[in-house]
Amino acid sequence: MGAKLLQYDEEARKSILNGVNALADAVKVTLGPKGRNVIIDKSFGAPTVTKDGVTVAKEVELEDKFENMGAQMVREVASKTSDVAGDGTTTATILAQAIYREGAKTVAAGSNPMDVKRGIEKAVAAVVTELKNISKPTKDQKEIAQVGTISANNDETIGNIIAEAMGKVGKEGVITVEEAKGLETELEIVEGMQFDRGYLSPYFVTNPEKMEVSLEDALILIYEKKISGMKDLLPILEQIAKMGRPLLIIAEDIEGEALATLVVNKIRGTLHVAAVKAPGFGDRRKAMLEDIAILTGGTVISEDMGYKLENTRLEDLGRAKRIQIDKDNTTIIDGAGERAALEGRVKQIRAQIDETTSDYDREKLQERLAKLVGGVAVIKVGAATETEMKEKKARVEDALNATRAAVEEGIVPGGGVAYIRTLPILEALKLEGDEQVGVNIVRKALEEPLKMIAANAGMEGTIVVEKVKEQSGAFGFNARTEVYEDMIEAGVIDPTKVTRFALQNAASVASLMLTTQCMIAEKPEEKGAGMPGMPPGGGYPGMGM
């Protein structure tokens, strides 16, 4: 184990602050409708141009080990917010920077970090409650389109397409984003089914960049038990290998020799195969396998029904036009099942929904129904160049996540106004000693997103904040038109979930950094010098060189 470097107290907090500032300053230029672009150099290919906070955050790596720790902690805020709420990454980064910057000052001035942390936590809890009070449910497709538009950096086409997709497949439906062949961004509704099981081995992956498996015109073997030996599988695999078609195996589990053999054959290219575990548990698993069989026109190979794995015939296999699998989900698109059988199944599930008394069962049955009926909406993103395509696709994915969040928890006025409207709650929150310092830190931090949006639009942030504070409700500063107006009427809205998560994640990481007393990093290795006693020039003395 190599030697370590240590930093304590003030020195450690200073390093963290430098790292936090380096990352946050790069990310926050992208905030708001007038936010700027960031160009990122790639080791191969053209540079990436982006206005997406989390993409910028993921690229920041600092030379100083201690400063880099600070930057990585804030990067965690951005990616966690992106993963859970789908948007709000830049806002979360700005809040984390503001809370930590103010907090570090107060700790340096002698405040107790633990008390400050408790104060921050209480303030955040109060703000979250108030955000939920301000929040309004999304009423119609128009509001959903507005959320999508804002999140896609004011691209109305994207907002409208997402709203249309949600209208077509419903809240429960599955929406995926793909690259289009042409220049236009369009929406395609595909009948398909998605379940939450990913590939059993990363060796099945066909697209290493995205870590996804894509099978075109595939066969599907549906088996309800575990497969561990190869003997029973061989007869059907040999027939499929001759046909040269891709195969997806869905079983309770595939392990040991069976999994190893499939992986080896996939790597050698003899079999184009992937395997996933069956979704659900117990009786629900049987029902879901039956759903998949009906959707794809296959049969569940189940010993209860008198089928044996070794006797499986090609006609027992399901078929689908396309199957996509990532590490968490499998989507079967355009199954070859008969329409009549599918309609019968849907009718049966609807009857069960009406009869069941358990809320949990009803929820699960509705999920199954959505998977059979809802289908999959595919948003095909078109662009002129590869660079533009990547940037646009990232925006569509952001916007999609934001709209989902809006449908889930409702909306609040956008443009940093919602945070300003929670300030009176913090004015009224009176705590003891250094806990009050924590509340004041959060109060100051909540003004930062609006300040930054105004600053990126070329305005004086503090003046804009004061003007917005004087008014109430959804009144705020619309940076796109540079007009003070009712944000909700102007269509500048944010999902409550995004606004809430950005603050919670920022405060959580910032208070962790505040209560850091010591940092440990690897000592960088000295650059190897020449051998001792070697004369300059590299030759040995007396060699007549």
From Swiss-Prot:
Q: What's its job?
A: Together with its co-chaperonin GroES, plays an essential role in assisting protein folding. The GroEL-GroES system forms a nano-cage that allows encapsulation of the non-native substrate proteins and provides a physical environment optimized to promote and accelerate protein folding.
| Record-annotated disulphide pairs | none
User: Subunit structure, briefly?
Assistant: Forms a cylinder of 14 subunits composed of two heptameric rings stacked back-to-back. Interacts with the co-chaperonin GroES.
Q: Where does ATP bind?
A: 30-33, 51, 87-91, 415, 494
Q: Does the keyword Signal apply?
A: no
User: What reaction gets catalysed by this protein?
Assistant: ATP + H2O + a folded polypeptide = ADP + phosphate + an unfolded polypeptide
Q: Which organism is it from?
A: Syntrophus aciditrophicus (strain SB)
> Which family does the record assign?
Belongs to the chaperonin (HSP60) family.
Chief location category: cytoplasm
What is the recorded name of this protein?
Chaperonin GroEL 2
